[in-house]
Amino acid sequence: MSTSRAGLLAALAGICSGPVWADTSSVTLFGYLNTDIEYVRGLGMGSLWREANNLSFLALKGTEDLGGGWRAFFQIQGNIFLNRGAGNLADRDTYVGIGGPYGQVTMGYQLTPYRASTWLPVDPFFMNTIGGANSIIGNGFFPGGNAQGNFSFDRRQANSVFYTSPTWHGLTLQAMYSLPNEKTASQTPSLFSSALTFRSGAVYLSYAYEQHNSYFGPGTKDTGHRVGASYTYGPFSLRGAAERLRFEPTPATYLTRWAWQLASVYQLASSSFRVSYIQAQAATGNSPTGVGGIGAAGVDSGARQIALGYEYNLSKRTALFAVFSRLMNKSGTAYNYSTNPVAITPTGMTLTGFGIGIGHNF
């Protein structure tokens, strides 16, 4: 048994056998399991059949009533890799926090407000499976610390402090700062991420901003702006997002890229149909090199992705699904599937994938 799995079992055993300190405290075990069988092909890699794990996780969360409208709470969440029998204790959203009349503050390893602003409310595939929007939007997912995965604006961030305001007339403010634990003699990298969201009935609107300081080197600054929207009318929802990323690979060079998404979900009694179209514009600037999937300025560096999905609910917690995705890179770009990327991604590759799977919440 791996150390991480043994540690998880030990933690569960301790919680199950430990004393209950107060009636106002609670601990809950929960999770999500999702896997599918996929056929994927692309120029330069041929084709392959594979089983894919789609962000399955196991988690514990707890809360304690402190009185006066205040509470303390925690979460420990780790990836479970169904297809290869492995897992980790706390490599997903893991934090401890306190909340009250003025909002809540958490500290730990957490998704950024920038990612969360369109993750569930806008993307029909929840930035998961081969249909996920973060193949292009955000320039690929990365979990880690400052200056690591410096290409990504779709992040789970280490050493982070996260504030969520109370909701006022549908408006909620979120802000995160990731401390520069990775500081060196010449570089002090840090991250600031924020989002303002509005929910009222069938309407959702969001604006998010994120800034990476000294990720590529001393004095560099990378920024992301993202807007999102969703409107639901009966069983039909129309969704969209637009994003502007600007990188400074060196203090004297920059690379800017726009991308947008248009998506829809049609919800029936026990099933749903999903569609998403994403387009990345060609990069501009004076950088002679690309960043992540984004190609260098001055080359044919656009891309498109279309994704189709169908989900059938067997119960409130279990669903069967099918997903199709086609990711079309121009000659100067190398975008990849963000969830379960393929190993070979030469510039200009077109990836086509189809999967059938099952998801279960508990």
Can you say where each PLM-predicted feature lies in the sequence?
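Outer membrane beta-barrel
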Residues: 23-39, 47-180, 188-190, 196-201
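Transmembrane beta-strands of outer-membrane beta-barrel proteins
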Residues: 27-35, 68, 72-76, 105, ...
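Outer-membrane beta-barrel "beta-signal"
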Residues: 346-362
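Sec/Tat signal peptide C-region and signal peptidase I cleavage site
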Residues: 18-22
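Outer-membrane beta-barrel proteins
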Residues: 40-44, 83-86, 116-119, 184-187, ...
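Transmembrane beta-barrel outer-membrane domains
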Residues: 49-53, 87-89, 154-156, 185-191, ...
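Detector for outer-membrane/organellar transmembrane beta-barrel domains
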Residues: 192-313, 324-326
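Structural signature of outer-membrane beta-barrel channels/translocons
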Residues: 61-65, 99-101, 164-169, 197-201, ...
